[in-house]
UniProtKB/Swiss-Prot annotation:
This is Pre-mRNA-splicing ATP-dependent RNA helicase prp28. Component of the U5 snRNP complex. Residues 70-101 are annotated as: Disordered. It catalyses: ATP + H2O = ADP + phosphate + H(+). It comes from the Eukaryota. It holds the Pfam family DEAD. PANTHER family: ATP-DEPENDENT RNA HELICASE DBP3. The keyword Nucleus applies. The keyword Heme does not apply. The Q motif is unique to and characteristic of the DEAD box family of RNA helicases and controls ATP binding and hydrolysis. It comes from Schizosaccharomyces pombe (strain 972 / ATCC 24843).
Length: 662
């Protein structure tokens, strides 16, 4: 290598400088510990610089003070020397001349009134400044601090006061400590109170900052409006109304009677669902409510629990008032849903001494009249059958103060609107809101004002008009999105049009062993239900059927077999799509697509209930183009749904069918 090669060129130097500048300008990542260390070093450096400046100022002050002192001493010495020199010079003259001069001056001052000259006192420069530096030997408090206790030091300022003011913290600590000592020497109740005071003092000493603690870990008194908003967001709760209570965090904070808490523990209700968290506090305040919630959300317990608590505060049913009818009426669109509500209601009613009776079609009037004669606190009925019983005078609703309409949208779709209006109009206390406000004022002032509750999966205009007619200032409660399927359900759509291909696909799904009983298969036509059930029985599955042509006894037996796991598969029409609660349904198979997206939503809502996951498989064909658009929109909103390309790209999936027909 030559000497010229070892010497870098100008371009290399410029390149190296550019690289260094880029490297210096590039931000350097520092960890949290390094940032803390650098901040601490900067702080220490600032403190040291401040101390150095203070020491320099102090040293300069001392130097200037010492210099002034020396100057004053030198000036005083010069004055003394001048006086001595003048005296000595006078002495060197003749004593007679000095005496004569002094004598003549004295005579002039005496007879002529001449005042003697005033000699101005010269002020020293050192007197203008105050030195704040004290010597250590000047400190007189050391002996007092070592010889006297803090209590004695404070006591010298008066009767328990410090400088004329009470030391509140010391006085409170003394009083609390004395109280705790006295309580610890008392009874067991006093000792418990003492331990509470000790815990309270420990909490105050800790001074926990609850702002950064999640709402689940906070005590109830530490909850702030922000925490309640987060709770509502976590459970998809949207509520509108006046003077609304906060949702429930758990059963223990709900303020329920101890007997009800025991029942909840017995039926294994560990935590309230979303609608139970929001609806129960509202209903306990005797407010009217419109609840819009997804299927399988626990609506039944949401109104049964407050209903039973309210009934427990009314006079007990005896022979003197039993003929006046029940205290509460629950309306359901189908027999199966009514009987299911009765079963769920008796879980809470029977342990507390109340009776819940169902009045549905398929049973003799005499049988239901006998049940009512025994006394019933709650009646669960279908609108048609209840209206027949009222018209036949089998029982009355003279003391009914609670009305619940479950699946209100389904009741109106099934043509029960007139029956519902007649039933509500026949009740003793009307909640119909009139413009003059007289009924409203009377209802609010009366202790027997009727409380009306309406639950629905959707809110069509007819349901809104019904609520407007019979509910007073209702609270509007929405859980999730209206008309949305449960997020725990995995939705799959398969494009199959031929019945033979559908059946082969059913066999493949069942033989995959991915889904365990119970399983529900929905079919649109009743004549196809029995054929599919026979084919299922032929390949080794125990299938039962449910449709409108079945008697009430056959319906109840089919559902009971599926619940008891004596049957594996239920083949049904949309009659089983709403309100039927069969636990642990792993698969809902839509052999035929539902005629509306609402019915589809309720069908797949039979699985994924009570916090568990489920699967819904739908066979889609060309005859279902009317629901392509709504189905595509519904599937696109779910994170657990798969949309096949045939559906996504189909022309009918981009325009709503109602818009085309118009």
């Amino acid at each position: 290598m030559t000497a010229q090669d070892s010497i870098p060129s100008l371009e290399q130097l410029v390149q190296q400088k550019r690289v260094k500048e880029e490297k210096a300008a590039r931000p350097k990542f520092l960890s949290k510990a390094e940032r803390a260390r650098l901040a601490l070093e900067r702080r220490q450096k600032e403190v040291e610089e401040a101390k150095a400046k203070q020491n320099d100022k102090l040293l300069d002050l001392r130097k200037r003070t010492f210099t002034n002192h020396l100057e004053n001493n030198e000036l005083a010495d010069d004055e003394k020397k001048s006086q001595v020199s003048s005296v000595s010079s006078n002495n060197s003259g003749t004593e007679s001349s000095a005496t004569d001069e002094a004598f003549s001056m004295t005579i002039r001052q005496r007879y002529m009134g001449i005042k003697p000259p005033v000699v101005k006192k010269r002020r020293r420069n050192a007197d203008k400044k105050f030195v704040f530096d004290w010597d250590a030997t000047d400190d007189t408090m050391k002996d007092a601090e070592t010889s006297a206790s803090p209590e004695a030091t404070i006591a010298v300022f008066g009767r328990g006061k410090l400088g004329g003011f009470d030391d509140q913290s010391i006085r409170k600590a003394k009083s609390n400590s004395g109280l705790i000592q006295r309580l610890l020497q008392g009874t067991e109740q006093d000792k418990a109170r003492a331990h509470e005071l000790i815990q309270l003092q420990e909490k105050r000493a800790k001074k926990i900052d609850w702002d950064d603690v999640p709402w689940r870990e906070k005590p109830l008194e530490a909850m702030k409006p922000r925490d309640w908003r987060i709770l509502k967001e976590d459970y998809n709760i949207s509520i509108k109304g006046d003077d609304l209570p906060n949702p429930l965090r758990n059963w223990e904070e709900a303020g329920l009677p101890s007997e009800m808490l025991k029942v909840l523990k017995k039926v294994n209700y560990k935590e309230p669902s979303s609608i139970q968290r929001a609806a129960i506090p509202v209903l306990l305040q005797r407010k009217d409510l419109i609840g819009i919630a997804e299927t399988g959300s626990g609506k039944t317990a949401a109104f049964i629990i407050p209903l039973i608590i309210a009934i427990s505060k009314l006079p007990p049913l005896t022979e003197s008032n039993m003929h006046l009818g029940p205290y509460a009426v629950v309306l359901a669109p189908t027999r199966e849903l009514a009987q299911q509500i009765q079963v769920e209601g008796n879980k809470f009613a029977e342990p507390l001494g109340f009776r819940c009776v169902s009045v549905v079609g398929g049973h003799a009037f005499e049988e239901q009249s006998f049940q009512m004669s025994q006394g019933a606190h709650i009646v669960v009925a279908t609108p048609g059958r209840l209206l027949d019983c009222l018209e036949r005078r089998l029982f009355v609703l003279s003391q009914c103060t609670y009305v619940v309409m479950d699946e209100a949208d389904r009741m109106l779709d099934m043509g029960f609107e007139d029956d519902v209006n007649k039933i509500l109009s026949s009740l003793p206390s009307s909640n119909a809101s009139e413009k003059d406000g007289s009924i409203l004022a009377t209802a609010n002032s009366s202790s027997s004002r009727r409380q009306t509750i309406m639950f629905s999966a959707t809110l069509p205009p007819r349901v809104a008009n019904l609520a407007k007619s019979y509910l007073i200032e209702p609270v509007m409660l929405t859980i999730g999105n209206i008309g949305q399927a449960v997020d725990r359900v995995e939705q799959r759509v398969e494009m199959i049009s031929d019945d033979s291909k559908k059946w082969r696909r059913v066999e493949e799904i069942l033989e995959s062993n991915r889904f365990s009983p119970p399983i529900i298969i929905f079919v649109n036509l009743k004549r196809n239900i029995e054929a599919i059930a026979k084919q299922l029985n032929a390949i080794g599955w125990h299938a039962v059927t449910l449709h409108g042509s079945k008697s009430q006894e056959q319906r109840e037996r089919a559902i009971e077999q599926l619940r008891n796991k004596t049957a594996d598969i239920l083949v049904a029409t949309d009659i089983a799509g709403r309100g039927i609660d069969i636990p642990n349904v792993s698969l809902v198979l839509n052999y035929n697509m539902a005629k509306s997206i609402e019915d589809y939503t309720h069908r797949i809502g039979r699985t994924g209930r009570a916090g568990k996951s489920g699967t819904a498989i739908t066979f889609l064909g060309p005859e279902d183009t009317d629901v392509y658009y709504d189905l595509r929109v519904l599937l696109s909103r779910s994170a657990k749904a798969h949309i096949p390309d045939e559906l996504r790209n189909h022309e009918a999936a981009f325009v709503r069918h109602a818009a085309i027909t118009q």
